[in-house]
């Protein structure tokens, strides 16, 4: 019994000393966003509409940013949904710093992935390794509901800059604005020149 009491006393002293000492924070910890668990219904999230751009003056597709550094605080991935209207497309582009998984919930599309082209239908999954060219054309009679997951944040910042929140005035981007946004976010997305 005598051995146990000194051990308990030493432990109690160590606990008191450790709880009264200020914790040193690492510089890296200051930049980690606060994560928040989320449960979102189909149409919940940050709803946005792509602004028109040179050669495409009409407002673009509707998309929803569901999980990213701003929504949920994820520092590791981005999850979004988008509707590709009948006759619409995702223009040829690549993501230098992130893999992407594209899941087409509905519709019919012609997908160009690297050197491969294929017609796919609702329920199809497309894995797009970083730096691989991708484009999608809606060739069906209905809108395509698409889900995209990126392995690293970045692209969502470009999407925010080139869109407006649903309900806001949607003014097309000027050529200068579009070029500046593409240059600023070239680490996350590069579009093929027409």
PLM ranges: what are they?
Residues 23-76, 164-194:
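A short, N-terminal "cap"/entry segment at the start of jelly-roll beta-barrel domains
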Residues 63-67, 80-95:
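Conserved short histidine dyad/triad with adjacent acidic residue
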Residues 8-18:
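Bacterial N-terminal signal peptides
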Residues 97-109, 114:
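Glycine- and acidic-residue-biased ligand/ion/polar-headgroup-sensing regions
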Residues 115-131:
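Short acidic-glycine-tyrosine-enriched beta hairpin
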